[in-house]
Amino acid sequence: PYEKIGAELVKEVAKKTDDVAGDGTTTATVLAQALVREGLRNVAAGANPLGLKRGIEKAVEKVTETLLKSAKEVETKEQIAATAGISAGDQSIGDLIAEAMDKVGNEGVITVEESNTFGL
């Protein structure tokens, strides 16, 4: 039963990451697994679980603050293409995303669907 709880926790982390960011599920899963492993190791060694929780929350706050300070706005079509190309691992896809975003504007919606036809 404990294994199932852990698996459900990691599954929820991946789902929430995908819902919020649309990317990063592998990183989130690896981080969640490390947090659980190290948390259990520390509790087994006598650490206070509530103290660990508070420490994790403080660390998350600091990391979030640091990331937000270093974040840069992505505004131009070229920046969007570069960012999307890196995320997709394919610059041509990045260019397509930038073109689509340019056409629909900031308030527009882009729907991406999987196709069974290759190259069409």
Curated annotation (Swiss-Prot):
Cross-referenced InterPro entries: Cpn60/GroEL, Cpn60/GroEL/TCP-1, GROEL-like_equatorial_sf, TCP-1-like_intermed_sf
Main location as per UniProt: cytoplasm
Residues reported to bind ATP: 23-27
Location of this chain's protein in the cell: Cytoplasm
Gene3D superfamilies assigned to the protein according to its UniProt record, in alphabetical order: GroEL-like equatorial domain, TCP-1-like chaperonin intermediate domain
Q: Which GO terms describe its molecular function?
A: ATP binding; ATP-dependent protein folding chaperone; isomerase activity
A Gene Ontology CC term for this entry?
A: cytoplasm
Name the keywords, alphabetized.
ATP-binding, Chaperone, Cytoplasm, Isomerase, Nucleotide-binding, Stress response
Q: Describe the reaction catalysed, as an equation.
A: ATP + H2O + a folded polypeptide = ADP + phosphate + an unfolded polypeptide
> Which principal EC class is assigned to this enzyme?
isomerase
Which Pfam family, giving just one, matches this sequence?
Cpn60_TCP1
GO BP = protein refolding
| Subunit organization | Forms a cylinder of 14 subunits composed of two heptameric rings stacked back-to-back. Interacts with the co-chaperonin GroES.
- What is known about what this protein does? Together with its co-chaperonin GroES, plays an essential role in assisting protein folding. The GroEL-GroES system forms a nano-cage that allows encapsulation of the non-native substrate proteins and provides a physical environment optimized to promote and accelerate protein folding.
Q: Which family does it belong to?
A: Belongs to the chaperonin (HSP60) family.
Q: What is this protein called?
A: Chaperonin GroEL
- The organism's taxonomic lineage, starting at the top: Bacteria, Bacillati, Actinomycetota, Actinomycetes, Mycobacteriales
